[in-house]
């Protein structure tokens, strides 16, 4: 048995999304993950696949929380490309994400004090909110140019 990701994944990525180039470490274990960067907003996303699910074929709560950490924390690094760590997350589960559903998430910085950022976030499938919450993230340093996500993306639409 291999833990390599396969094109199961023969699903269609929604317009505007790019595959995140996270092919090793923890990103590989939970992926594939995607992002959409618009002029005034960003979103991260994933398709619920079997390796994300529990016995009820819903995305495990731990997967949703991990995804929230990545989606909400990204709000800290969107303009300054900063490395950050999670200090605290408070999450409210409101619904489940089922096998085969496209899950999206984003966050908004609502407070910054020194190197601490408070982010309010939401995770959803279509019109259904899966989770809301708040994260506190601590900036640890500026990312080196080679480690900045925008330079390592693989585009779905030739861009």
Protein language model features and the residues they cover:
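Terminal targeting signals and extreme-terminal segments of soluble enzymes
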Residues: 1-159
């Amino acid at each position: 048995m291999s833990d390599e990701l396969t094109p199961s994944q023969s699903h269609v990525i929604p317009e505007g999304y790019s595959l995140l180039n996270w092919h090793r470490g923890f990103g590989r274990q939970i992926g594939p993950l995607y992002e959409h960067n618009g002029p005034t907003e960003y979103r991260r996303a994933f398709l619920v696949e079997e390796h994300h699910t529990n016995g009820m074929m819903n995305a495990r709560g731990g997967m949703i929380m991990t995804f929230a950490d990545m989606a909400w924390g990204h709000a800290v690094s969107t303009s300054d490309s900063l490395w950050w760590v999670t200090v605290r997350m408070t999450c409210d589960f409101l619904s489940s994400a089922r096998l085969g559903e496209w899950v999206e998430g984003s966050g908004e910085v609502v407070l910054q004090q020194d190197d601490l950022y408070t982010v309010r976030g939401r995770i959803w499938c279509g019109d259904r909110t899966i989770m809301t919450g708040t994260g506190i993230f601590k900036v640890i340093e500026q990312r080196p140019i080679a480690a900045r996500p925008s330079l390592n993306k693989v585009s779905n639409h030739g861009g």
